[in-house]
A protein has these predicted regions:
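An acidic/histidine-cluster motif and surrounding catalytic segment
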Residues: 1-118, 126-165
Length: 165
């Protein structure tokens, strides 16, 4: 079984980070890797940022001058990843999440911010592993199925509203 080291940082002040969210995100990363049969130690970096910052990154890397909910920056290609020279863990990539967008989407979809962050984490780790949905079609269907499978394993299917009490 893969062991995921998840490095989480907060570089925004607009939205309070919910209690327990870091543990939930680590569980999400671990669940994706487990579901995908990933067997080696791996590292993922996740950073919470503002709408302004994610808009700038979206413009720079995707030529879309608008805020988005999440961006994934895979460090591997075709299942080949560099290793952390100190730990030997595979470096999967970096994820940035707009907390403002996540909060808006949680409200729009009628579930908790925790559930939205869990979804965005699962979605993004799948991107780091090579899944895509941009062109639609069967790739999009397959990615959505993987998301729902992982979230269901975590008890966070679409009708669930995770609240850490």
């Amino acid at each position: 079984m893969a062991i995921a080291k998840v490095i989480i940082s907060n570089r925004q002040k607009e939205v309070k980070i919910p209690t327990g969210i870091r543990l939930l995100m680590r569980r999400c990363c671990q669940a994706v890797l487990q579901t995908e049969g990933f067997s080696e130690p791996a590292e993922v970096s996740i950073t919470f940022i503002s709408n302004d910052d994610i808009r700038k990154l979206n413009a720079e890397f995707r030529n879309v001058d608008a805020a988005t909910d999440v961006l994934s920056f895979p460090l591997g290609e075709n299942g080949v990843y560099d290793r952390n020279p100190e730990t030997g863990a595979l470096l999967l990539g970096d994820i940035v999440i707009s907390m403002q967008k996540a909060e808006q989407q949680a409200e729009m979809y009628g579930h908790s911010l925790q559930r939205e962050i869990a979804y965005l984490t699962v979605h993004s780790v799948l991107h780091l592993l090579g899944y895509d949905h941009v062109n639609g079609g069967i790739e999009q269907v397959h990615m959505r199925e993987r998301e729902e499978t992982v979230l269901a394993k975590l008890g966070l299917q679409r009708d669930a509203s995770y609240v850490n009490e």
